[in-house]
Amino acid sequence: MPEISLRHVVSCSSQDSTHRAENLLKADTYRKWRSAKAGEKTISVVLQLEKEEQIHSVDIGNDGSAFVEVLVGSSAGGATAGEQDYEVLLVTSSFMSPSESRSGSNPNRVRIFGPDKLVRAAAEKRWDRVKIVCSQPYSKDSPYGLSFVKFHSPPDKDEAEAPSQKVTVTKLGQFRVKEEDDSANSLRPGALFFNRINKAASASASDPAGPSYAAATLQASSAASSASPVPKVGGSSSKLQEPPKGKRKLDLGLEDKKPPSKPSAGPPAPKRPKLPVPSRTPAATPASTPAQKAVPGKPRGEGTEPRGARAGPQELGKILQGVVVVLSGFQNPFRSELRDKALELGAKYRPDWTPDSTHLICAFANTPKYSQVLGLGGRIVRKEWVLDCYRMRRRLPSRRYLMAGLGSSSEDEGDSHSESGEDEAPKLPRKRPQPKAKTQAAGPSSPPRPPTPEETKAPSPGPQDNSDTDGEQSEGRDNGAEDSGDTEDELRRVAKQREQRQPPAPEENGEDPYAGSTDENTDSEAPSEADLPIPELPDFFQGKHFFLYGEFPGDERRKLIRYVTAFNGELEDYMSDRVQFVITAQEWDPNFEEALMENPSLAFVRPRWIYSCNEKQKLLPHQLYGVVPQA
């Protein structure tokens, strides 16, 4: 883009004796234009161009100015510089923030304004005069002005269509910017990593050629010679894991193509009764699975049985497909680990109970979510259900792990039919006698509300294996911890009011503790607590966005988060344009001025405003609790 030459200075409102306005005409010097004295709020200069030009872009080098505005005009009317009407070419642009102006930091910022930053109506016309207006309202300690200013006309059509291949040098005041050719073979950031990825991709693309040749060789050989590769593969056990994987894939392909080789899979069929063993000793299953992977020399007939017993990596995400879980009573980091395992198995996660939720995974009974889901008739299970499904790599019936809720469903029935009868038969008699002891032990620790029939039957624990010891330790760690994101005080208050209004249903005698489906009947026959409407919390913070700034004493930050969430407000993790209220316990901060410059509608309030709204149960004027600058 050609640079527009400047002829002379038409007028100037203020200039220093050394740093005069004529310095803006001299591109090869390091001189500047500054105001005559410090403390002037606004200074301006009018420059005459060589001829009328269309201005395509503007380069401005600052020298202490907070704001710069560029206007354009024409001398054809014969009016003087003071009487002439100017049009805005570049709206007032910020070069220094208030804090930078007071501290004097970054006074020489350079900004390049392209055609997208200029006012289109003025940029499309031709002008021969330019007026530059600088202002510095934040500092009165030093004079200010500009280091340089450059105007560029639109590029020629020939340049736009065929840009020159020469290396050009652009001069911005005292800096020379070298524009490198894109075709030059230079080392760019991240180039080494991209090359490594490309090399790995090309290497992986060339790998399948080996197995395809081996497959052709094996297909050409006779069925009797198929046993000869076994010592080869066994001898290459010290190599990397990739070659054995490729050979196992070949074996799978040969099993599909060669029906005569399938009778070799017949002898392992009597090993079917060994399937219940992993359920009794679950620790042996993870150890045996890597062992089966690590032995590449195993015959094809034996390799087919463990492959069908465990889910492959692509099937892991489908084990809990269609399940929507909600967690209650767990504390980080175990809470996040449990959630990640459920998501890895294909389940979906919700922070609160929603109509599409299917399972509430509870650490212990009588949490707020436990009472809510129990009243809605949802399914409440223990965490061992997710842990066992993750360890066994298959979906287990959730009714074995029920704490409360629906006793059976089509989902559980489908799972039980898919499992072998030999697996389920030895488990049920061994697990059933223990729920009573656990229920009696949990009774004294529960609130004084008499348990309903659902709660007396609810804690029917699942398999009491090695994972139970780990689970009980984590339960001890989770006990007494509140759910992150739960407004537990409000939910507990609502539950207490509901208990005082309606006495609990009398216990039904003679129920079979082993019949899981009776829970569904009790929900429909006995008067359900779900029939009573739960009082809703007011939502006077709806549509309002809050940001917590600074330090808060004690657990005040946690209380503020709970109140804002309870009254349907939204908390922002970072300062953004959406924030409307900044809650702080500190005095006025200089950063607040910068935030107000970016977002004039911000309000800085004390935490007492949130507490007062909670006490009155309505939205109070925030102006009474505002944080204002001190005189």
Curated annotation (Swiss-Prot):
Major localisation: nucleus
Biased composition regions of type Pro residues, renumbered to the chain: 261-270
Pfam families: BRCT, BRCT_2, XRCC1_N
GO annotations of cellular component type: chromatin; chromosome, telomeric region; ERCC4-ERCC1 complex; nucleolus; nucleus; site of DNA damage
Covalent crosslink: Glycyl lysine isopeptide (Lys-Gly) (interchain with G-Cter in SUMO2): 178
Positions of the UniProt region annotated as Disordered: 225-314, 406-537
Record key words, sorted: Chromosome, DNA damage, DNA repair, Isopeptide bond, Nucleus, Phosphoprotein, Repeat, Ubl conjugation
GO molecular function annotations of the record: ADP-D-ribose modification-dependent protein binding; enzyme binding; oxidized DNA binding; poly-ADP-D-ribose binding
BRCT domain boundaries: 315-403, 536-627
Keyword Ligase appears in the UniProt entry: no
Biased composition (Low complexity): 277-291
Entry's Gene Ontology BP terms: base-excision repair; cerebellum morphogenesis; DNA damage response; DNA repair; double-strand break repair; double-strand break repair via nonhomologous end joining; hippocampus development; negative regulation of protection from non-homologous end joining at telomere
Modified positions (Phosphoserine) in chain numbering: 142, 206, 228, 261, 371, 408-410, 445-446, 460, 484, 517
Record-linked PROSITE patterns: BRCT
Modifications made to the protein after synthesis: Phosphorylation of Ser-371 causes dimer dissociation. Phosphorylation by CK2 promotes interaction with APTX and APLF. Sumoylated.
Region forming the signal peptide: none
Location in or out of the cell: Nucleus; Chromosome
List of residues that carry Phosphothreonine: 281, 452, 456, 487, 518, 522
Assembly and oligomerization: Homodimer. Interacts with polynucleotide kinase (PNK), DNA polymerase-beta (POLB) and DNA ligase III (LIG3). Interacts with APTX and APLF. Interacts with APEX1; the interaction is induced by SIRT1 and increases with the acetylated form of APEX1. Interacts with (poly-ADP-ribosylated) PARP1.
Job description of the protein: Scaffold protein involved in DNA single-strand break repair by mediating the assembly of DNA break repair protein complexes. Negatively regulates ADP-ribosyltransferase activity of PARP1 during base-excision repair in order to prevent excessive PARP1 activity. Recognizes and binds poly-ADP-ribose chains: specifically binds auto-poly-ADP-ribosylated PARP1, limiting its activity.
Protein name: DNA repair protein XRCC1
